[in-house]
């Protein structure tokens, strides 16, 4: 945050931290307002006010799916990027535990990933934390070398939230597909900044968060 200092107090704020969060756009506020006021129905209910909310929810799902070239059935709304990361790592680990209990990630992931991996280690999972080089990057070769017969998940951040490095997600995804290992990327800092298509990037799970691109917090 940068402040313009006046004689009496710091009165004017210039915000320069959009990597942390963004101001909600006026267009988003206008689109949401009817559903915070008169059209406040529960989208899971069968009566009209709930059905109206459900229709708008599905329209939103279609919009998000289109930006990723994904199917609407592949879009899940959570309370934010951290829950999305938790959901991906813990659920894939649980679903694939009969196949193996080895996970590959990096040492520069968001705490939502690192904490989930630490939790799984307490349950008996083995986690390999790849170290980045001097430029803050990991290489596809590192990923390949870390893969074991019992590896069931690879999770690598798309764009780092502190230093801004962009990892080789396409190449890592290709390796994961060849080895039939599920691949998750935390794209919270990349979505809406870098063109993303699940038809191009070979990812199985991708996390994003609306408050990083002028949307509401908690989505």
Located regions from the model:
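Pyridoxal 5′-phosphate
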Residues: 2-219
